[in-house]
């Protein structure tokens, strides 16, 4: 699956959640609430990673793949809601980091 499809499916799913929010609470969550939900799920990923590495046990270790997927979902939704292209965000970050590491002090410019 490419990032464009991730964005399309994520935003379609988010629209369905907005319908549920309007039904249950009379309004949709704002960008800030979506960002907080992402941070909550990212924290859960951290906690489940501790279990995965044997650092702190959890009875919910089987949730790790879904929580990682949910974090990607939130990021795609947040990018879309803030008028950013998710694929461009990811590509730009990776290109920037690759360039920074290529030119890091002590590097000869060649892969080790």
Label every model-predicted segment.
Residues 1-68, 72-112:
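Flexible "arm" and connector segments at domain edges
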């Amino acid at each position: 699956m490419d990032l464009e499809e991730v964005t399309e499916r994520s935003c379609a799913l988010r629209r369905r959640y907005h319908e549920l929010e309007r039904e249950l609470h009379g309004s949709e969550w704002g960008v800030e609430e979506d960002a907080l939900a992402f941070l909550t799920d990212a924290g859960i990923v951290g906690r489940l990673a501790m279990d995965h590495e044997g650092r702190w046990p959890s009875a919910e270790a089987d949730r790790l793949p879904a929580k990682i997927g949910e974090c990607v979902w939130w990021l795609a939704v947040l990018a879309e809601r803030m008028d950013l292209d998710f694929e461009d965000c990811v590509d730009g970050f990776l290109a920037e980091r690759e360039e920074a590491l290529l030119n890091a002090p002590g590097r000869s410019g060649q892969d080790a």
